């Protein structure tokens, strides 16, 4: 028990609370709101903080609060919508920070600790085990080849710190899921490690091909994928997709699942045409959508 307490107390100083304001007219405000709260992990003594993208996208102002109550104005230093991670920068030096665990060091059954903000200088802690490491696909045109699912439920705001029992950062807590019982889904810290220098230098990942963005919410349905909703003014809506459309094929490939849909879409680039075979009200037809650039649309 004393060892666990020492571990928690060693991690706490490197955890932060985030308060973010977003303009009413930013495209993300409709779904994510204009006043957001989050958690973050200090990953650099010079003030870089790792968190989740959905907390910071569109930020007009960011306030960072350390566990002892000291506050700093923050700036969004980098966004990576494909991984779902973001970096905040504060003007401070000599900060306590978390080291990244070795690459591919996380294993199923491994004990872990989550620390998340529940208030400006308040933190909550939960413990559990890694239950699985598998892909995840979300309805907002998002997919990761590997995630960390844990039996530890996120006790606070999104962006919480996931560490091993050596106090090393292994992930950033993104979602609480209720599919079977309660568990949390974290983005592996390896996604940050792979592009750390690019994110710090450019504020984005430039070495990876950009994915086209369509602005729709595909949902699995009876062995097919159906359009569950549309982003107003997005490419899918502008080129004629409608809510309720069943996607039969993309680029001549039959689509049976959301991962298959994303894999086919993402073979293209922003500005290129993507061909769909659609079933709508018992009529099937072909339709083309020119993919947009999500990073441009949601730029702060």
At which residue positions do the language-model features occur?
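C-terminal cap/linker of serine protease catalytic domains
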Residues: 1-8, 114, 165, 169-222, ...
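Protease-domain processing segments flanking chymotrypsin-fold serine proteases, especially trypsin-like
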Residues: 1-32
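Flexible, gly/ser-rich surface segments that form the specificity/activation loops bordering the active-site cleft
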Residues: 3, 33, 55, 98-104, ...
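Active-site region of chymotrypsin-like
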Residues: 14, 23-26, 33, 91-97, ...
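Terminal peptide-recognition signature
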Residues: 16-18, 40, 47, 51, ...
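Conserved active-site neighborhood of the chymotrypsin/trypsin-like protease fold
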Residues: 23-25, 31, 37, 42-124, ...
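PDZ/PDZ-like groove recognition
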Residues: 24, 153, 200-264, 279, ...
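Short, compositionally biased
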Residues: 125-137, 261-270, 294
